[in-house]
Amino acid sequence: FNVWLFFILMAIVLLAGPTLYLLNITVNTVGLWLNNFIRMSFWTDPIQQGGFPEAWTIFYWAWWIAYAPMMGLFFARISRGRTIKQVVLGVIGFGCLGTFLFLSLAGGYVLYLEGAGLLDASGILHNQGMSKLVSAVIAQLPFPAIVLAITTIASLIFYATTFDSAAFVLASICTLGLKGDQEPKKENRLIWALALGFVAVGLALAGGFETVKSMSVISSLPVIPILVMMC
């Protein structure tokens, strides 16, 4: 259901927004990515030291490294009976495709609004934060109330499924004698979901997004040696 909501949102942005511009920037993005992938992967900015690699590249590497064990166990659990090809296409292929579509269309629309002088997106992001920017961008679309409702519902479902997946994996690990075809008790999953929620709220209240970023980097450190040994 949440996947359909995602495609509905992307269709609204594509059709109601500058369609030709969004298609052009999507194609252009692929070219830029292919052209700069190796350089950006090894870019540490030693001369200017602007802080971009640390704040974005390394942070997202650490984010996904910390995320990998939990999601790997979850995908392995729900992929029972499927071939490796199906798992790779489903997890990596369609996952990357969805991320690419969202960043190209949603990000491209924000760039269009900024470039056309319709919205001071960078100013809103700097002074008021991401949540205000999302609301301001949605307000530029037709039927903003409906689009905002769809966005809110989709976001809640995505968050809920992520928490449920994490709670499922943690509950499975903490349940002794659990066989491959068995599931942990629901109350165990509920406890872990609540614990994860409290941790997220606590980190957000303690220092905002910067604290979350720091914890992501710290959490990834123990996993890095395991990934190296697996390779």
List PLM regions with ranges:
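Membrane-embedded translocation segments of transport machinery
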Residues: F1-R82, L89, F94-L148
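Extracellular/periplasmic helix-loop-helix junctions in multi-pass membrane proteins
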Residues: L203-I218
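Hydrophobic alpha-helical segments of multi-pass membrane transport proteins
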Residues: W4-L14, G98-G108, I150-C174, W192-V199, ...
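Short helix-terminus and kink motifs of transmembrane alpha helices
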Residues: Y21-N24, N28, L73, R82, ...
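Membrane-interface alpha-helices at helix entry/exit sites of multi-pass transporters
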Residues: I84-G90, G177-I191
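Transmembrane alpha-helical segments of multi-pass small-molecule transport proteins
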Residues: F1, F6-I8, W61-L73, E183-V201, ...
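Alpha-helical transmembrane segments of multi-pass membrane proteins, especially transporters
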Residues: N2, G90-G95, R189-W192, M215-I218
